From Swiss-Prot:
Membrane-traversing stretches: 46-66, 72-92, 141-161, 193-213, 277-297
Origin species: Methanothermobacter thermautotrophicus (strain ATCC 29096 / DSM 1053 / JCM 10044 / NBRC 100330 / Delta H) (Methanobacterium thermoautotrophicum)
The entry's keywords: Cell membrane, Cobalamin biosynthesis, Membrane, Transmembrane, Transmembrane helix
Membrane topology qualifier: Multi-pass membrane protein
Signal peptide: none
Gene: cobD
GO terms of molecular function: ABC-type vitamin B12 transporter activity; threonine-phosphate decarboxylase activity
GO biological process terms, semicolon-separated: cobalamin biosynthetic process
Cited NCBIfam families: cobal_cbiB, PRK01209.2-5
Name under which the protein is recorded: Probable cobalamin biosynthesis protein CobD
Chief place where the protein resides: membrane
Length: 297
């Protein structure tokens, strides 16, 4: 079986079909496992380590058995499973839905955005909604696409699933409030480590993507270097900063960070440009990943 074939088929499946049904989605199962396990474990850093191992093991170890299957069964199962932990279509569709609603009903746009971001969306303006939609799109192309592919290259299907387990844990318990600060410490630090390289590769690839699209590639590179470390997360700023520069916009989470230079305003066209930029960046990343796997078997 060719890992390149698995990757390309998985990407095609995700683009054509999108997310698996809720009841069959492995990331949903991961979330359910986290909820169940954390009710058993105490709230300590040791509990966070145990939680990570306890959730990761059943989602990764059985995947090694797939290697013993013969083609084409191996190829089909591996491609379906990999497609389930990448989310290109969902990211793009979600951003476009927010933009579409913003044209007609700002309350509906706020509601749809609230399902994508943690910030309070009830009083956001048009520009703030557009900024938040661009931020979540460009940040999550790492979490939901390039990082799983990166660990698929390194460790095969178990690597991609291990990453999504850690990312899911971080999303659920990786917070600084009293309830999660201790149990979420290990998953949050591990998520930072696992995202370190993929986030930087993805941010850098946005620069040639901007060039190919006729966007501000020089600004993309400049803002990437200047603003990438302004976010609380050590990783999320790389793609957001590169996008802000490419789009010649300023992205802001009030009271938390400001990325990019002041601009005349954010509108729906900028959100559409962000979708184009993110999509081409993912194409470049996928092609680069396939090339690496062909050169280094």
């Amino acid at each position: 079986m060719s890992e390149v074939s698995v990757l390309l088929l998985a990407v095609i499946l995700d683009l054509l079909i999108g997310e698996p049904p809720h009841r069959l989605h492995p990331v949903v199962w991961m979330g359910s496992a986290v909820e169940w396990m954390r009710n058993i474990l105490g709230n300590s850093r040791i509990s966070g380590i145990i939680l990570t191992i306890a959730v990761a093991a059943p989602f990764t170890l059985p995947l090694f058995l797939i290697n013993h299957l013969q083609d084409p069964l191996n190829l089909i199962i591996s491609s379906i499973l990999l497609s389930a932990v990448i989310s290109i279509r969902m990211l793009v569709t979600s951003a476009l839905e927010v933009g579409g609603s913003l044209k007609e009903d700002i309350e509906d746009a706020r509601r749809k955005l609230s399902m994508l971001v943690s910030r309070d969306t009830t009083s956001l303006s048009d520009e703030q909604i557009t900024s938040a939609a661009i931020e979540t799109l460009t940040e999550n192309i790492t979490d939901s696409v390039t990082a799983p592919i990166f660990y698929f290259i390194l460790l095969g299907l178990p690597g991609a699933f291990l990453y999504r387990v850690v990312n899911t844990l971080d999303a659920m318990v990786g917070y600084l409030d009293s309830e999660n600060r201790d149990i979420g410490w290990f998953p949050a630090r591990l998520d930072d480590i696992l995202n370190y390289i993929p986030s930087r590769i993805t941010g850098v690839l946005m620069v040639p993507a901007a060039l190919l699209l006729g966007m501000n590639w020089r600004g993309s590179f400049r803002i990437l270097l200047r603003d990438a470390r302004r976010t609380p997360s050590p990783n999320s700023g790389f793609t957001m900063a590169a996008a802000a520069g490419a789009l010649s916009v300023q992205l802001e989470k009030p009271g938390v960070y400001v990325l990019g230079d002041p601009c005349d305003g954010l509108d729906n066209e900028k959100l559409l440009d962000a979708v184009k930029l993110s999509s081409l960046t993912l194409i470049l990343f996928t092609l680069a990943a396939a090339g690496v796997m062909l050169v280094i078997p």
